[in-house]
Amino acid sequence: MIENKKVCVILPAYNAARTLERTVAEIPMAVVDDIILVDDASSDCTSAIAARLGLHVVRHAANLGYGGNQKTCYRHALERGADIVVMLHPDYQYPPRLIGPMAAMLAAGPCQAVLGSRILGNGAVSGGMPLYKYIANRALTKLENLLLGARLSEYHTGYRAWTRELLAALPLERCSDDFVFDNQILALAIHRGYAIGEIACPTHYFPEASSINFARGVVYGLGVLRTAFAYRAHRMGLIRSRLFQP
């Protein structure tokens, strides 16, 4: 708990058995009140390990996708009374020690969302991010900043923290069940006028860390572009995008 606000960590998981215990071991329980793991129909023992670790476990009977997993995570976090929700991937790619600082930024009040940016501090490439992913990240981010009217260092990190107010207000059910969910929720937050902060975040790419392949990365990139152009066209009154309706 930070400043009397309940902090919940959500772990959207799929076949995370090899890295889950190491990730959970480093979560700062001095500030975290609740940990929820949503298992998206894993074929390994992710749920069993999570239960042994004492996490609140929700298991999908069928795979709902990365975005679908997050929707379940956020719904359960709000139902369990979270004031601040931090999403941490259970693949040990992001450092759990940043949960405290990210939650504190929200508890202090200036922001309603905080992103753990791999670009701030120049830690992306040194942490093992493939060069083509780094270049794509930078190119997409520049275009998104132009179309969304924002000034973020990146939109593609999986390390995020949100206030209850933001999550309860955004129509998350309109967002994709796939990876572009991450981008759409940020576009919605910007559209609704929420303040988004950033914190420098080192990252670690290694064989056990989850990552989408090149083909799915292309699909994701196209989805990012569609979202950004739809946002700009909606704001200009050229179209009425369902995603950005009141």
Segments predicted by a language model, with ranges:
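Short beta-strand-to-loop acidic/aromatic patch adjacent to the donor-nucleotide binding site
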Residues: 82-93
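Short hydrophobic beta-strand elements that form part
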Residues: 8-12, 36, 59
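Acceptor/aglycone-binding surface of glycosyltransferases and processive sugar-polymer synthases
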Residues: 58-79, 96-179, 206-215, 219-225
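Hydrophobic helical membrane-anchoring modules
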Residues: 1-3, 149, 173-246
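Donor nucleotide-sugar binding loop of glycosyltransferases
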Residues: 16-19, 42, 95
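A short, conserved beta-strand element in the Rossmann-like catalytic core
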Residues: 41, 65, 93
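Short, well-formed alpha-helical segments that are part of the catalytic scaffolds
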Residues: 14-29
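A conserved acidic beta->alpha catalytic loop
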Residues: 39-47
